[in-house]
Amino acid sequence: MAVFPLSAKHRKYALRALAVSIILVSAAYIALTERTERVRPQRVEQNLPPLSWGGSGVQTAYWVQEAVQPGDSLADVLARSGMARDEIARITEKYGGEADLRHLRADQSVHVLVGGDGGAREVQFFTDEDGERNLVALEKKGGIWRRSASEADMKVLPTLRSVVVKTSARGSLARAEVPVEIRESLSGIFAGRFSLDGLKEGDAVRLIYDSLYFHGQQVAAGDILAAEVVKGGTRHQAFYYRSDKEGGGGGNYYDEDGRVLQEKGGFNIEPLVYTRISSPFGYRMHPILHTWRLHTGIDYAAPQGTPVRASADGVITFKGRKGGYGNAVMIRHANGVETLYAHLSAFSQAQGNVRGGEVIGFVGSTGRSTGPHLHYEARINGQPVNPVSVALPTPELTQADKAAFAAQKQKADALLARLRGIPVTVSQSD
């Protein structure tokens, strides 16, 4: 069990006390060694009371982290963390039947916030159902445990990686602990120029991407901010840029001169005429479940019945009801890219081979939805990736955007320069 105090002030005092203790112990040791012949050693045994949250004298709130063991239930983990039995009973009686609280993996951790009075205030942990990571957050208010709608304490840090290809690019990136979603996004970003699988021994990949941390543990990867691939001595670069007018709708990738990086394998058609982007790709608070989860696509708000079009040529591989997606269509495209269109009110007559721009359905609110919109996903080899990197048209930069892009690129260039000449590196920068 690990305990993490929240107060920086208390940590400072603790470090000072530790330093003083080391000095005193060292002095005592020196004094004792001068009198070893006069002092007879004695063995003293004393039974200590069990660890308890109450009456510890700790006045500040702190997080307790408890690792899940094979076969553990949530009640087992909470009991081992020191939570009172009656509190555990209140949680399990109210939420014990919910799937996300029943299925715990042995490689995850449960975090409990302990208040200054020694009582539990919050419980947080991630679940992974069918590749979708969800944050389960419970909080106690007015003596009642309920699902928390407060923001999770997640920190985003840019992560730097420099990898020299040995046998294969994907294998070398995996050994350097580059997440699979980053590997597949990288493949999509440069798909119009070369295949990631075509890199040879001695080629290099340098990456800057966002990583999300929860209580000090990396839980997910965000967008690739900059990428540099040296293939056969030729350098290829991609830079992520989002203009102010795009708001929360996500950005796009451009080369070092601010030009559109690629044609994205024929993805030059928006899937619909939309009002606004209501939810981008990435972590968000789910409006119905009130849990933080990885939103694996982009939501486009649009009126009921708005035509939805295939974003590129492909083959319809699924058309029908698909759980929380409601009415959905899936299309397989070239280069291992697959797109999904969800919450449709109805389907068109399209089936089999479809052309880019062909109507495949109509906007609706079927499945788990709060109102009419299109949920649009892109996957590469089954792995969800940000659609802007592979499956949406990229707009040309305006003159105003070019100046902002140049300033942003300059910062990324400085970080990439640090990585050149380093075979494998891992670092974060605040």
Curated annotation (Swiss-Prot):
- The name on file for this protein is DD-carboxypeptidase/endopeptidase Mpg
EC assignment: 3.4.17.-, 3.4.24.-
Please give the organism: Neisseria meningitidis serogroup B (strain ATCC 13091 / M2091)
Upper lineage is: Bacteria, Pseudomonadati, Pseudomonadota, Betaproteobacteria, Neisseriales
Q: How is the cofactor bound?
A: Binds 1 zinc ion per subunit. Binds a divalent metal cation, probably Zn(2+) in vivo, Ni(2+) ion is found in the crystal structure.
Q: Which family does it belong to?
A: Belongs to the peptidase M23B family.
Does the record carry Hydrolase as a key word? yes
Disulfide linkages recorded for this protein, renumbered to the chain, are none
Q: Where in the cell is it found?
A: Cell outer membrane
